UniProtKB/Swiss-Prot annotation:
Source species of the chain: Carybdea alata (Hawaiian box jellyfish)
Keyword Acyltransferase appears in the UniProt entry: no
InterPro entries, per database record: Pest_crys_N_sf
Signal peptide start-end: 1-18
Keywords: Cytolysis, Disulfide bond, Hemolysis, Ion transport, Membrane, Nematocyst, Secreted, Signal, Target cell membrane, Target membrane, Toxin, Transmembrane, Transport
Function per UniProt: Has potent hemolytic activity. Is lethal to crayfish. Causes cutaneous inflammation in humans. May act as a pore-forming toxin, disrupting normal transmembrane ion concentration gradients in susceptible cells.
Name of the protein: Toxin CaTX-A
Length: 463
């Protein structure tokens, strides 16, 4: 017996003797569940004193009572902490003040995050139900949308943190399994025992559930019009591609091992090869939108382009090559002079108008003047300069495109060029990624910025 297999046997024996008997676990679980049930009964008793309809909240708490009976003792103990936080927050709920209600809800969410490191399993369902009941019961119509947004954002934050934690756990699992497979690969005389141990260690569906969750998250976020959501989506794409590469690396190692063994294992190698091809195709379909941009993905594009402005974007570009995703269209410019022609009015291009000491950018008809200098900065973004004046977008609603003599226009004048599949570009700024440069429909055709998607008026041909 090899030293490695001896260590595995020792580890198995240690783990086998480290856990208490099933009977002891069962008694411990019943005791913990009873404690939670008692706490919930106490809270329901307090609710009865409120003098208002608390049916939904009681039902939510009773749902927790039933759910914990099926959970491991360790989970029940954690849920007990959450239930306690509900009881501790009742004084805030009783006031009826919407800010107190929101504060109480956030206390519960924070308790979940502290106890679980993220709302896991039973906790997230229980907490979501409790929060919903509390909001409907105590806040009524006085609950402002801004307060609700705070609570929704808190849930998003902890859900995302949970997902990131799970990805990190999957990476650790991968590292352990790939180390084991590599050790077997170095064995000169492969036996059926070696190959069967690899087959048991490497599941064909490794990481499938996690990647499926990430795919769903990416598909939702790719069309979001919320800045934070779009930014998180880019980060999740990076994690998704990392995990996908790990999975295919692992499968490739096993395929090579089976091919080396030959015989009956050739069929297993072929089956895994087909699975790997299907995996790569699914990954390619999930992320190709970044390099084949449509307007509905434009906000994600504002956080992905220019690619060399962030480590996540650089990492995504490198990893997409592994899956055969086509490179994006040109998204950087080298300081030469160009003409920016509008798609909606293709006889109009950006020019500059000076009036009373002010410099405004607008559209000029039938202009063939290639006088706009698009220069790439060290941070990856670009400046747009015309006749010594650098364009920047003002902070006003649908801000104007003004010009400054300053060499550095600041983040309002750091532009991102997002390449669309139709050959045009959408243009946003580092300062306001969700506002896109467009030509207004007035007689002057002034250059302004529009929130989210200005359609053809906000699409530009760079000539």
């Amino acid at each position: 017996m090899s030293r490695g297999y001896s260590l595995h046997l020792v580890l198995f024996l240690v783990l086998s003797t480290a856990f208490p008997s099933q009977a002891r676990l069962s008694r411990y679980r019943r005791s913990a569940a009873d404690a939670v049930s008692t706490d919930i009964d106490g809270i329901i008793g307090q609710l009865n004193d409120l003098g208002t309809d608390t049916k939904r909240l009681k039902e939510a708490l009773q749902g927790v009572q039933e759910a914990v009976k099926k959970e491991p003792a360790t989970t029940i103990a954690k849920v007990s902490t959450i239930v306690g936080s509900v009881g501790g927050s009742l004084s805030k709920f009783k006031s009826g003040d919407p800010f107190d209600v929101a504060s109480g809800c956030l206390d519960i969410i924070a308790s979940v995050a502290t106890t679980f490191g993220g709302p896991y399993g039973i906790a997230i369902g229980a907490v979501a139900s409790l929060i919903s009941s509390i909001l409907s019961l105590f806040s009524g119509n006085s609950m402002g949308s801004a307060i609700k947004q705070v609570i929704d954002d808190a849930f998003k934050k902890y859900r995302d943190q949970e997902l990131e934690d799970n990805v990190k756990g999957a990476k650790r699992t991968f590292n352990a399994v790939i180390t084991f497979v590599n050790s077997v690969s170095k064995t000169e005389n492969l036996t059926e025992v070696h190959l069967d141990s690899v087959r048991d260690a490497v599941r064909v569906d490794a990481f499938t559930n996690m990647l499926g969750v990430l795919e769903s998250r990416i598909n939702r976020g790719s069309v979001s019009t919320d800045n934070n959501e779009a930014m998180r989506t880019i980060n999740f794409i990076f994690l998704y591609l990392q995990l996908s590469v790990m999975r295919e690396t692992l499968l490739t190692q096993v395929i090579l091992l089976y091919k080396r063994a030959g015989g009956a294992y050739d069929e297993l190698a072929l089956s895994l090869s087909l699975t790997s091809d299907q995996n790569k195709e699914a990954t390619r379909e999930t992320v190709t939108f970044l390099h084949q941009m449509e307007t509905k993905y434009s906000l994600c594009g504002s956080y992905y382009y220019p690619i060399d402005h962030s480590k996540a974007a650089i990492g995504i570009l490198k990893l997409t090559k592994f899956f055969g995703v086509p490179d994006p269209a040109r998204y950087t410019f080298d300081g030469l002079y160009y003409r920016m022609q509008n798609r909606a009015w293709n006889r109009y291009s950006i020019c500059k108008e000076s009036y009373a000491g002010n410099h405004m950018f607008r559209g000029c008809k039938d202009s063939s003047y290639h006088g706009i200098r698009i220069k790439k900065l060290e941070n990856g973004y670009h400046t747009i300069t015309l006749r010594s004046k650098a364009m920047y977008v003002t902070k006003h609603a649908q801000g104007w495109g003004w010009g400054t003599a300053d060499e550095d226009p600041g983040e309002q004048g750091y532009f991102t060029f997002i390449p669309l599949t139709n050959g045009f570009y959408m243009v946003s700024t580092k300062k306001w990624p969700d506002y896109f440069v467009y030509m207004e429909s007035s007689a002057h055709g002034y250059i302004r910025s529009w929130h989210y998607n200005p359609d053809p008026q906000g699409q530009w041909k760079i000539l």
